[in-house]
Design a protein with these regions (language model features):
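Bacterial N-terminal signal peptides
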Residues: 8-17
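Conserved, well-structured interaction surfaces
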Residues: 42-51, 55-66, 88-169, 182-217, ...
């Protein structure tokens, strides 16, 4: 049975938790007496300065949370790629052209979802800055050893949010104080912010607890040392991208010439990836024998999951909306849930999985619903007219309005085990949302070895053998395919395509946008509203 994670107590501080800056920096007034009470002892300091920050890891409204909700980080990383598509189905899913705009890379500088994502990331950074200031204020009045650990955890969490900003937006403001007026914030280069994130993780990781964050208990859902080391490996893996301040000139730094100090040793980017992947391995993580264990109802016991968003329909408001919006209405109804009949796999996904051939990857049926579907008792699901519901994967396109398969085109999201006890249309479920897992550690290491001129076959095929997929040689091409096969629907595709230099290429239903061969769409624009507030911010190249 899932146990509550400790920061649920932070609901009593909801008003304090809203202390972020209006438009990422403007502090709201608060009651001083209440604030002093909130930090009067070490336990309260932890709850209010550290644990309260985790209320923002998940979410229930658009653009909030690292995953689980719509029109936020996950959608920007998924529906802008060859992994997923939200077809227009007659009067459904056009939404003012939003989903087509993502898929076609035609989002513009006034996109509400991009702005809301920016504001969400800076909201949590603002809260983190305030927490660090509060922790520093109480130095000498509480246990200093505990304060060091609290500070490290908040710094690591803030670094995680800056990592997403570097990945999504490139050149962004580096805000380290809760009191700086919004108009005075200067813009930093992508590399400057990246270097800051690296330093923060280097300095904070040794002070973090070594517990497995996915396991219920004191550190459930929190940033621990293995989580930080996973993020470190991810930062090093993308070093060529994140240290490039001009991503439109066709020139990238070489990872073999980017160096990091790791435990006193100078290692290039690829060696650094290997070192931190090995560190995560030594922490005791391993591949689960059954791929689906990682996404099961009550998946807290997974030996593979490293960082998760805790889910408990009776305790938390965190939602998983992606299954809900993908399943056909009748399909979801057959589980006693609701659905919105939306998101589907692309034609490119079907080709990568070799769907419809004898060589289909074993993970296809674990990640997608295709063809005839059944309820949990094995009964065929039917449409309202009594005919059998059958998903037609190859009929998917950007606009299928008025087609005979308008409502049934496309393979749908499966991935997570059905929790038929879920509430709020099934969006409140017991399956923790998986952010980081050990299979990624193995594939990161394999890729780093290949990029460094080494052999990465062992790590690649450990992942493949788990699902009885045939042996493959580790090359950059096979590794990119493997990441699609292994991490379908997990929110990594955009970052992977950018790193492999393939994000702007054309594919089914998506011609290359004029001018984007330069790479300008590999980052999103700084929202125009934010730039109007702060004249110091220069728009990213290619956007007007």
């Amino acid at each position: 049975m899932k146990r509550s994670f400790i920061y649920i107590a932070c609901f009593l501080l909801l008003s304090l938790a809203q202390l972020s800056c209006d438009d990422f920096l403007r502090e709201k007034p608060r009651d001083r007496i209440f604030e002093e009470e909130a930090y009067k002892n070490l336990s309260d300091l932890y709850l209010n300065a550290v644990a309260s920050l985790y209320n923002n890891i998940g979410g229930y409204s658009d653009s909030q949370g690292l995953q689980g909700t719509g029109r936020g980080i996950y959608d920007l990383n998924t529906f802008t790629t060859d992994e997923a598509i939200m077809p227009t189905r007659g009067g459904d899913w056009y939404d003012g052209g939003f989903w087509q705009g993502l898929y076609l890379h035609n989002w513009g500088v006034n996109n509400d979802a991009i702005q809301a994502t920016w504001e969400y990331l800076y909201k949590v950074i603002g809260l983190s800055n305030k927490s660090l200031e509060r922790i520093a204020q109480y130095a000498g009045t509480h246990n200093d050893r505990e304060l060091v650990a609290y500070e490290a955890e908040v710094r690591a969490l803030r670094a995680l949010y800056y990592y997403h900003l570097v990945d999504l937006f490139g050149n962004v403001p580096l805000v380290l104080s809760s009191s700086m007026p919004v108009k005075e914030v200067k813009q930093s280069t992508r590399q400057e912010v990246y270097d800051f994130v690296v330093r923060e993780l280097q300095q904070s990781a040794p002070e973090l607890n070594t517990a497995h964050s996915n396991l219920p208990g004191t550190y459930y859902g929190r940033i621990t040392r293995p989580v930080a080391h996973f993020l470190w490996a991810k930062l090093a893996l993308n070093a060529e991208v994140y240290t490039d301040n001009d991503w439109t000139d066709g020139i990238r730094p070489d990872g073999r010439n980017i160096y990091f100090n790791v435990d006193g040793e100078e290692l290039n980017a690829w060696q650094t990836v290997e070192a931190y992947c090995d560190s995560v391995t030594k922490s005791g993580y391993r591949l689960e024998e059954d791929y689906t264990t990682n996404f099961a109802v009550f998946n807290e016991s997974s030996a593979e999951n490293i960082f998760i968003i805790p889910m408990n329909k009776n305790l938390y408001t965190n939602q998983m909306q992606y299954l809900f919006r993908s399943r056909h209405y009748n399909h979801a109804k057959a589980y006693g849930l609701s659905g919105e009949n939306g998101s589907s796999a692309t034609i490119e996904v079907l080709k990568t999985f070799a769907y419809g051939t004898p060589q289909v990857d074993p993970r296809f049926d674990k990640c997608y619903f295709a063809g005839i579907v059944y309820d949990l008792k094995g009964n065929v699901v039917r449409l309202d007219d009594g005919t059998i519901l059958e998903y037609l994967p190859w009929e998917v396109a950007l606009d299928i309005s008025n087609e005979p398969y308008e409502k049934t085109a496309g393979a749908r999201m499966k991935k997570y085990e059905v929790d038929d006890t879920g509430t709020k249309d099934g969006k409140l479920m017991e399956n923790d949302i998986v952010l980081y897992r050990y299979a990624d550690v193995l594939l990161m290491k394999s890729e780093a070895k290949v990029r460094n001129g080494e052999n990465g076959d062992e790590e690649l095929n450990r992942v493949r053998s788990r699902v009885a997929a045939p042996y493959r040689e580790a090359t950059l091409n096979t590794l990119l395919d493997e990441r699609q096969l292994e991490f379908a629907w997990e929110g990594w595709r955009r970052q992977d395509l950018v790193r492999f230099g393939l994000f702007t290429r054309p594919y089914s239903s998506r011609p290359q946008l004029a001018g984007e061969a330069s790479g300008y769409t590999t980052v999103f624009p700084i929202p125009d509203k934010v730039r109007r507030m702060n004249p110091n911010l220069v728009q990213n190249p290619g956007y007007k």
